[in-house]
């Protein structure tokens, strides 16, 4: 009896489609099919496949060992591997247009038979070639074969030819001359697929029908289907044409969707990062400006001990030119300048600290506070400017102290040496 077994995996090229419609009561095929060594015992009859034994999507294979048909509970490891394989195939699977459909007891089923198209003759049309499969006589088609007997059938005939004994181009040409619309050449004692090539250019130019090559197991399965119903027909389809629609490639569709999502997320994160850096830079700049402003606007405590000149005892007024010595004592320029010009030692009148090293700088620059607002926060004129302004008033103060005396240079120098740290007093006191 016929057993349902998976067909061994083979390279996919074109495919053969078979459609069969069988009644419920089918007996053993009366004719004995030729047996092959190593496949099954000689003389063992074959039966038509019943409904519970429908061909699998992989294909029928009458040459597989019987032990592979044994049904049982799969092992946990095998079940896990099968689940993973189904998941991978569900993602990588591309819709196939070449199928084999076997109709048994109102149950539809399809089987794919792997084949390779010939390198000569016309290629298969995109819609394929449909016809009734018939074995030629002689089986190798090395000689002229009998014409197909179609009767009133609407479809043409497709020849099933055995390999060897002559060239492929001669076999196909003999089938064409007999009236077949296509040819299927099957292997012998092997399921390997070979590419059929021509030998004679003359024969190649005469071939006008397509042809394909299949393995021996596929040919035996086709014979079983033909023996079950004489009205069974086959469909030869070319390789699946490249689908230009993105929906035909699930992997590309998923990759495209994930890529767009990833690009959107990355661009959003990039924009947010740039905005965050910009906000941080603005805050840092504001803090820096505020800090620098506070540093420039230093607060100075006003003390009453620095609001008058120690020489003339007059209070400082706005617009007065002041001179601050390195010892931080402040004088009017008109008061301290005569002191420095007459004294043998250039020193502070109060603390006697020498200022000879800075006298050149006092003479070099004189500035005025009239253009500046001393009430501004942090306003502090340079020391050298204040010191330079105190020089011009010395002679005037000395002249005011002794208006009736003619002050010579010698007397002024002698007077400078007697000045105490306290402010000088008038001669009449």
UniProtKB/Swiss-Prot annotation:
Biased composition, class Basic residues, residue ranges: 37-49
EC id: 2.3.2.27
Subcellular localization(s) per the UniProt record: Endoplasmic reticulum membrane
Stretches of the chain found on the membrane's Cytoplasmic side: 272-429
Segments of this protein annotated with the region Disordered: 30-64, 358-381, 409-429
The protein's enzyme class: transferase
Annotated InterPro entries: E3_ligase_sorting_rcpt, PA_dom_sf, PA_domain, Znf_RING, Znf_RING/FYVE/PHD, ZNRF4/RNF13/RNF167_PA
Topological relation to the membrane, as annotated: Single-pass type I membrane protein
Transmembrane segments: 251-271
UniProt catalytic activity: S-ubiquitinyl-[E2 ubiquitin-conjugating enzyme]-L-cysteine + [acceptor protein]-L-lysine = [E2 ubiquitin-conjugating enzyme]-L-cysteine + N(6)-ubiquitinyl-[acceptor protein]-L-lysine
Signal sequence, start to end: 1-27
Chain intervals with Polar residues compositional bias: 409-420
A Pfam family that the UniProt record links to this protein: zf-RING_2
Zinc finger motifs (RING-type), residue ranges: 309-352
Keywords, alphabetical: Endoplasmic reticulum, Glycoprotein, Membrane, Metal-binding, Signal, Transferase, Transmembrane, Transmembrane helix, Zinc, Zinc-finger
SMART domains associated with the record: RING
Main location: endoplasmic reticulum
Keyword Oxidoreductase attributed: no
Function noted in UniProt: E3 ubiquitin-protein ligase that acts as a negative regulator of NOD2 signaling by mediating ubiquitination and degradation of RIPK2. Also catalyzes ubiquitination and proteasomal degradation of CANX within the endoplasmic reticulum. Could have a role in spermatogenesis.
Assembly information from the UniProt record: Interacts with CANX.
Protein's name in the database: E3 ubiquitin-protein ligase ZNRF4
Organism: Macaca fascicularis
């Amino acid at each position: 009896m016929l057993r349902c077994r998976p067909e061994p995996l083979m390279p996919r090229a074109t495919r053969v489609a078979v459609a069969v419609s069988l009644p419920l009561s089918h007996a053993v095929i009366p004719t004995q099919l030729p047996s092959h060594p190593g496949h099954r015992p000689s003389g063992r009859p074959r039966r038509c496949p019943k409904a519970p034994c429908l061909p699998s999507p992989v294909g029928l294979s009458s040459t597989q060992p019987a032990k592979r048909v044994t049904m049982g509970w799969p092992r946990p490891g095998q079940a896990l591997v099968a689940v993973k394989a189904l998941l991978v195939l569900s993602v990588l699977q591309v819709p196939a247009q070449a199928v084999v459909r076997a109709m048994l007891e109102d149950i539809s089923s399809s089987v794919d038979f792997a084949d390779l198209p010939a390198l000569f003759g016309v290629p298969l049309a995109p819609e394929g070639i449909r016809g009734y499969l018939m074995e030629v006589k002689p089986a190798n088609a090395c000689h002229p074969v009998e014409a197909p007997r179609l009767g009133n059938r609407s479809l043409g005939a497709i020849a099933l030819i055995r390999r060897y004994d002559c060239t492929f181009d001669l076999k196909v040409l003999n089938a064409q001359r007999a009236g077949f619309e296509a040819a299927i050449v099957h292997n012998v004692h092997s399921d390997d697929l070979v590419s059929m090539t021509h030998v004679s250019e003359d024969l190649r130019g005469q071939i006008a029908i397509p042809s394909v090559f299949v393995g021996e197991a596929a040919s035996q399965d086709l014979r079983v289907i033909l023996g079950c119903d004489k009205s069974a027909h086959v469909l030869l389809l070319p390789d699946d044409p490249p689908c230009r629609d993105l929906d035909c490639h699930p992997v590309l569709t998923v990759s495209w969707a994930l890529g767009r999502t990833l690009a959107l997320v990355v661009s959003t994160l990039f924009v947010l990062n740039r905005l965050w850096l910009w906000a941080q830079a603005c805050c840092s700049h504001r803090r820096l400006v505020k800090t620098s402003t506070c540093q420039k606007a230093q607060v100075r405590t006003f003390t009453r001990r620095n609001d008058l000149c120690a020489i003339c005892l007059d209070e400082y007024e706005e617009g007065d030119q002041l001179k601050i010595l390195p010892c931080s004592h402040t004088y009017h320029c008109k008061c301290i300048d005569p002191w420095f010009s007459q004294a043998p030692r250039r020193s502070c009148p109060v603390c006697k600290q020498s200022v000879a090293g800075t006298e050149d700088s006092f003479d070099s620059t004189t500035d005025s506070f009239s253009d500046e607002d001393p009430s501004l926060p942090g306003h502090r004129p340079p020391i050298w400017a204040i010191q330079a302004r105190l020089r011009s008033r010395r002679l005037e103060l000395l002249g005011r102290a002794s208006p009736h005396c003619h002050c010579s240079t010698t007397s002024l120098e002698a007077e400078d040496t007697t000045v105490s740290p306290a402010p000088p007093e008038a001669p009449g006191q």
